Amino acid sequence: PGMDFPAELRSEVPADKAGDAVRFDHVSLTYAGAGAPSLSDISFTAKRGQTIGVIGGTGSGKSSLISLIPRFYDATEGSVEIMGRPIRQYPRADLRGKVAVVMQKAQLFGGTIRSNLLWGSQNASDADLWAALETAQAAEFVKAKPLGLDEPVEQGGRNLSGGQKQRLTIARALVGKPDILILDDSASALDYATDAALRKALAALPGDLTVFIVSQRAASLQHADQIIVLDDGRMVGLGRHAELLESCPVYKEIYESQFKKGDAQK
């Protein structure tokens, strides 16, 4: 590791306390072999401590956008900065420590609840684990298990419900104390009350955790500091919920279609 970096960049990169958490400057992404770009000319700034929503229809580019933040892919055009530095200056291992991604499909391993959470950080104390479980709205169901943290987990978490698995993977990400947490539709198996409690607990965490919430549900993003609205790889809206209802037809359409179904009530 570090072989592809100039010598002065190989050491641990100190977090630049002056920089914004994430900055996209005219970013486009075309996957190898694809004719059309998956993202075109995306620019936004996420300040430290903000919650950023990302919404759009299927295939609008939501997952492509957030895949650039942990550098699963590199932008084809434009630049991405993390904590005030160009993303390519970070050794990938350092970046993975700063950016935690929780996917919709929760990945759990055979073992115990504790051993799964310790993937987030091998040095975490039980107090750290319980704090992460509280924030992730998982403490209650873990406490209800006969063995608590030592409760067995089957490979893939087969002995847990979808919502329990998702909450444990969110807790595991929090154990690593990242600077940036990305929830990629990862609250989709949670009911509204739990989803709302999770968002509230994340917002109340001390420090400057920046949270990206990718969701199909407008209701999940109503309290975000900024919402990025994507349509066919382009950013068609950027603002808060109330602003976007006025200014962004794509957002308004998503919200109203869900509201009519009773989805957006809470």
Where are these regions (language model features)?
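ABC-type nucleotide-binding domain
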Residues: 5-266
